[in-house]
């Protein structure tokens, strides 16, 4: 009974957010939801890591980010199949109540791998660089603050986009953000420990 009520509330909140659609914003959400458009940014992040940290520490932080991705993907797949929650775009109640669908797709909904991966990347690289800075600066440099702001902005947009394209419920996104943030933080701390052993 409790989880049924939680699911119903999640459906209604998702429908409310999803209803804030327009011909102007829909392409924006599709852009942020598309994995392929982020390839140039991934390349830029790798270049930034090596430039600012040196190749050894840069590769350590990169390894932390890759481990975060791997963990979030595997955790999402396991939980999705264990829970078996269908996506909003396949839910008769959601469709009947006007869900705006911008992307098709199968599989299960809980939890959002996009949200987990985007926040995992933001946390693992931002905290990883902050703690592994090659020059050991005591204060955070402006470029790193700008990087953190940009990464968390993008992560938020990616997460929200999953609701607007009709692929996930709000609850899927929130849980994905939490899991990705925790995983990213843990792997960033492990990377910083490894960096402390490198000269």
Question: Each predicted region: which residue ranges?
Answer:
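Alpha-helical membrane-inserting segments
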Residues: 17, 45, 71-75, 79, ...
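Interfacial segments of alpha-helical transmembrane regions
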Residues: 46-75, 148
């Amino acid at each position: 009974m409790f989880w049924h009520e939680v699911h119903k509330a999640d459906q209604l909140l998702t429908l409310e957010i999803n209803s804030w659609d327009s011909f102007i914003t829909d392409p924006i959400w599709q852009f942020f939801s598309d994995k392929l458009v982020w390839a140039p940014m991934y390349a830029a992040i790798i270049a930034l890591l090596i430039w600012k940290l040196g190749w050894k520490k840069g590769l350590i932080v990169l390894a932390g980010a890759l481990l975060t991705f791997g963990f979030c993907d595997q955790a999402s797949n396991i939980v999705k199949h264990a829970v078996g929650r269908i996506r909003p775009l396949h839910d008769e109640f959601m469709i009947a109540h006007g869900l705006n669908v911008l992307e098709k797709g199968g599989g299960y909904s809980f939890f959002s791998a996009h949200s987990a991966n985007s926040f995992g990347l933001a946390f693992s690289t931002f905290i990883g660089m902050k703690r592994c800075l090659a020059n050991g600066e005591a204060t955070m440099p402006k470029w790193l603050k700008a990087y953190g702001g940009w990464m968390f902005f993008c992560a938020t947009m990616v997460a929200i986009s999953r609701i607007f394209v009709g692929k996930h419920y709000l609850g899927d996104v929130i849980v994905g953000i939490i899991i990705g943030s925790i995983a990213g933080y843990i792997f960033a701390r492990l990377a910083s420990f490894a960096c402390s052993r490198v000269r």
